[in-house]
């Protein structure tokens, strides 16, 4: 199994659990080979993705946020990743201009070798679409010589991959990379089980990894693959050969 990228893998997640379901395998594969992975959660998903917690008597917004932060922190640890929280609020995320420069500053510091984030179009959850735009704008601003010129750390051109949305057919998602996560799927499953507020998704994303694994075998001939994750490139890949 090969990791996705050389250098730091940065994952921009709209809510505190998104990175687990959709990119947990890539994160674990990268860190298993000694790579660094850093997850940026724009929000905790406290309003829109924590229904189970809100059913508890006397629950408050701050208590939900604390629970979601604890879950995501444990999940990141299971994947071998660092995690930071912008606490921007969700449903909806705030306007992009409130987050873009903060993200750009983080990208300058992290100097990612690749970035993973949401698909461009998700009519079911526009926070995901907004996270995509915030990510691309943050990358663009971090590349600008006139942004914080005093730090002298202009970002290069890290590739961006979008991970699979919950309803790919409706979100115009067309995978062009199937990543073998067979060896690290136990870590992904452990991370999923940290997200107790969304226990109903554990089985769904286990099944999805198996289905993508079948497709990976079909597309590679490698019958050892059992689990995979699907990604779509945003920018062309630059290579010296066809493979």
Language-model region placement:
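Active-site rim/loop-helix segments in enzyme catalytic domains that contact anionic ligands
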Residues: 1-110, 240-241
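Metal-dependent de-N-acetylase/amidase catalytic core
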Residues: 1-12, 33, 82, 93-243
């Amino acid at each position: 199994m090969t990791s996705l990228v050389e250098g730091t893998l940065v994952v921009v997640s709209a809510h505190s659990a998104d990175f687990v379901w959709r990119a947990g395998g890539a994160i674990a594969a990268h860190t298993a080979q000694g790579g660094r992975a850093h997850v940026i959660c724009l929000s905790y998903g406290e309003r829109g993705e924590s229904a189970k917690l809100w059913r508890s008597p006397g629950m408050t917004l701050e208590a939900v946020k604390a629970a979601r932060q604890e879950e995501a922190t444990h999940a990141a640890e299971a994947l071998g990743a660092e995690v930071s929280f912008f606490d921007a609020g969700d449903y909806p995320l705030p306007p992009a201009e409130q987050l873009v420069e903060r993200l750009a500053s983080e990208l300058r510091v992290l100097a990612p070798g690749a970035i993973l984030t949401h698909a461009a179009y998700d009519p079911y959850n526009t926070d995901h679409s907004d996270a995509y735009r915030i990510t691309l704008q943050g990358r663009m601003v971090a590349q600008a010589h006139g942004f914080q010129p005093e730090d002298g750390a202009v970002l290069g051109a890290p590739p961006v991959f979008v991970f699979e949305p919950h309803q790919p057919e409706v979100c115009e998602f067309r995978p062009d990379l199937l990543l073998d996560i067979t060896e690290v799927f136990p870590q992904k499953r452990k991370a999923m089980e940290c997200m107790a507020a969304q226990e109903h998704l554990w089985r769904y994303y286990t099944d999805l990894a198996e289905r993508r694994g079948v497709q990976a075998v079909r597309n590679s001939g490698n019958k050892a693959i059992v689990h995979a994750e699907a990604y779509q490139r945003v920018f062309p890949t630059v290579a010296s050969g066809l493979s």
